[in-house]
Structure formats: C-alpha cells, structure tokens
Amino acid sequence: MKYLLFTLVSLTIYPLLSDLTNWSLYNHKVVHSNTNRSKLKYEGDGVKVYVNNNFDIYIFNPNKVTFGVSSSRPSGKKFYMNSNFFNKRAIGLVVENGVQKSRRVSGGGYFYVSGNQVNVQRGSCPQNTDYASQTILWGIDNGVTNKSLMRQRHAKQLTYRNIVGKNKNGDIIFIVSNFGGVVTIKDVIEEGVRQGIVEGVLFDGGTSVEYKFKDGWYSTSFTALSDAGKKISGFGKPTTYIYVN
C-alpha cells in the first residue's frame, strides 16, 4: 500500500517538478545564449539528428519515411510534434486520413501530405490532401525571411519555439527548442536558414512545444508543460500532431 501511494505521488509530483525546471528559464535573458554549432547525434535510415545548445534538429528524407497528421498523441512512430494550440478545437486547417477535422483560416502556412508528396509552404494548400496542419505564422518563403514577423513584440519574447520546413532537396526539417532553449522568433528562423530551409512555418511555441523521437538506439523527448501541468493551468490537451514513421 505504501509503495502504491509512493508511486502515485511520484507520478503526480515528478511532471510538475519538470515543469518548474523548464519554466524557471522562461523569459530569463541571463540564460539566453547564441546558438552554437550543431553536432550530429544520430543517423538512421532516412533521418539525421543534430543538437546544439538551443535546438534539436531532425532532417528526414521523404523518400525513406512517411508523414502524417493525427488528432491524438501518436504511438509507435519515429517522431511526433505538437502542431496546434491547447484549445478544445484546433485552429486552422487539419486533415487526418483525408478527413477534414478543422477549417482553414486566412494567412499563415501549411504542412501537408498529398499522395506521395509532402510539402511545407506559405499561404496555400490543395483542397484535397491526405494530411494537413495549418499554422498562422510563416517564417521563410522561397528563401526570404519574414522580417515583419520578427519585428513584432511577441516575436522578441524568449520562449520555447519551433520551425518546420523543407530544404532545396525536398528534405523535411523540424527545428525544436530543447531544454533551456528559450529563443526569439528571429533566433529560430535564423537557425532554419543555417540548416538550409527555403520554405518554413512556425507552429505554436511556449507551453505548446512537445515532441518525441525514437529510432534505433537513440531516443529523446521534450515537453514544455506536462499533462498534469496543463490540467492545473487550465490548458486543454493538444489537438493536432505531425508525425514521421
């Protein structure tokens, strides 16, 4: 009985302690540092993983992996990342297995899969897709960065962020904050440029950042705010995930 009680308490307290650690860094300019050089941490079939002091970087070859969008947290996938807000309903277009789950909104950009083609682009998405996830923010369009977005007040706030894009070879790239990687939108867009992204969109950052990777001997994950923390804070659960398999 004591062991059961200890286990239950541990399962409740540990995620909250993790949240406290994650957010003790939040908006603290003293911990913000320029992004250093990325190092290759893992290379598998169709994927390379690089890490630096602010970001984890996942580069996928679309000829060797498959992509999708799920309205619930995926299991058994190589990689997944939350791609929407913590609302009861998703914001923007969401398509899962060819079924539209949420309507598109104006502006922003899209990650989508149509047949054997996976794409990331600003502004438009085909009417008929197998999978799609929309964001209200775009960061890089045909190699040009969104300087107007970078100048906005919210863009200068230090928080956990991400950018999803493709390079000139068609590889799909996920750049996501790791533990302590509180950055501005300018920081994450510039990292996208360094990694060769020519089309890139930004999905919700801050408490929304959540991802997991597992392939071969290498695994890593990061959740900016645990499920317990979301419940206490009044946030809903994520409604949309992009995944790779």
Which residue ranges define each predicted feature?
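Gly/Ser/Thr/Pro-rich low-complexity, intrinsically disordered segments
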Residues: I13-N245
